[in-house]
């Protein structure tokens, strides 16, 4: 049994919120640089270069890489041999978010009630997901999610007979409908299987997977590669102004499902695709 004070969770999440909003992750940085060299449209290439300049300035001057600093999404993988002390874990997570956004001078974008729309003024609460795993460590993934791309995301409740071709069409439909509104080049997270809520969660977590990696499942790997190729042939391009780079990656997660269903979720993220991972 390992004892861990929840203050460590708060400290880490504060740092992660600030880091995610000022610095592009290494995998995304590589993907963006590669896109500049492979983009076929002169205008698209220019837009990608401008985005690269923006990212450099943000890191150098500690300015957020996007004015929408997002709603904080936190994934916690908690070892079953960890015992927390010093307070409530969920309160500690939200305290870390609060410190990160207040002390980091990040935009506060969360409202207390979806209808009454009163701002909480500290970007809490976050969206928190828990998973119990073997061991005595805690893995934290923080992914601030802007709503330009979030609003473009979709869930499709397909029929089993729709099969993999139906899945492909659902993903392509979501991307086409998103168009320039998702601030492309985008990263596309896809969840297949489970239930209505499970496929959406898988699609969200897929966005935290390293860009450029591929699924270990052969048919899923092929699906990721085919979808990326087909999406980039749509021609939406950087900034939605045309080009060969509409998406930087398609990451697909799958899960067992009911005999009567084929749930598919598409969670789209913009070109910054913020995510930071710490293990305590």
Predicted regions and their residues:
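Non-transmembrane, aqueous-exposed alpha-helical and coiled segments at domain scale
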Residues: 1-190, 195-280
